Amino acid sequence: TAGRTTVAMKRIMAYSGLFFLFFVLFHAYGNLKYFEGEDVYNGYAAHLRTMFMPILPREGLLWILRAIMVACLVGHAGAAFHLWHRNNKARGNQKYAVKKAHAEYAASRYANRTMRWGGVILLLFIVWHILQFTTLNATPGGHYVHGDAYKNMYLGFHDAPWTYAIYFIALAALALHAWHGVWSALQTLGAIRGSVIPGVRIIATLVALALFVAFMAVPTAILFGWVDAPAAGSWTALHGAVAGH
């Protein structure tokens, strides 16, 4: 039935969204290793590519995570589009079939618009981020090298400061998406009760702020010269490892 389909779509969005949340929290943790210096950061990136070898091939874990990410992305975006289309159709057929207080309705509409356009911004940003730091097809700031993640990051923000604006906008969208998404996902999964609502709101706010601050810390430090520039020459050539990012 339509009701069961709607519930299923919301659950798909909730589970896939929570997976994304855990992934970006781990990613943010990894990015903060930049402050420990070039060897630590590049070594960490190299470790991700050799983790669980020889049980898995080189970069095996990363490819597994990428496959899961693609599946979650398709599911999340597909479910969001399905719900948006259904809601639009319902409003067109019977605009006020379910009456709400004006303030509640306006807040709901605002949240939905924010999530929808925030999702579009994040999708475009993911493509840009992959092109810049994974495939190295977009290299603002200079010549990037596979395996020299520290240098690539430095060039991307120090020598091409306009990329900072891209990341600021995208990560603000991520923070808003996470703030609303944590609440929405837990509500969908039945984890919110009256007594825990204040706590959930606090957690959602802290998660959103933590993501924004953690992800913007490195670009900000690079832009204002608060971290060391990469050493001359190729870190990859000196260490014989292909770390990447």
Outline where the language-model segments fall:
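Membrane-embedded alpha-helical bundles that constitute the cytochrome b-like, heme-associated redox core
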Residues: 1-245
